[in-house]
Amino acid sequence: MKHTHLILATLLSFATLTAHAAQANVTNAEALTKKYISIAQTVNPEFVSSVTDGKMFFNRKIKMPNGKEMACASCHTTNPANPGKHALTGKAIDPLSPAVNNKRFKDLDKVEEKFTEHCNEIIGADCTAAEKANYIIYLLTERTPSAKK
């Protein structure tokens, strides 16, 4: 009986730590969003972040030099709470949603690096602060993976 209580206590502690880690990364994402909103408002004082604009940005197809159309959703699926797969390499990609993946937004320098890399790769230039703010706001709303078929 004592052994069972110890196992339950350990499992509850692990679940609590996991929940705190996920919440910390959601908090990191929110902090980064505030930074981008502030920058965007220096460019356009009337800027207001938008989940709708973030979703449109995430799903926007851009014609690549090879003629193929790509979007963030091409690798990350249309639901950022789902795991994705790299369109070229087939490599598995963990979900983007920080509510689902407690490693997303853990390292904000890496987030900045990935924004620069992917924006230049797909759009051909760095994303604006407004685009980044909207993108993260959208990711924060996606908390439920799609049901498996």
Roles of regions detected by a PLM:
Residues E69-N79, Y135, L139:
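The canonical Cys-X-X-Cys-His
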Residues K2-K55, A99-K149:
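Post-cleavage N-terminal segment of exported redox proteins
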Residues T52-M64:
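Sequence context of c-type cytochrome heme-c attachment sites
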Residues A73-V111:
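Gly/Gly-Pro-rich "capping" loops immediately C-terminal to redox-active cysteine motifs
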Residues M64-N66, P80-H86, T144-K148:
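Secretory-pathway/luminal and periplasmic proteins that interact with or process carbohydrate-rich
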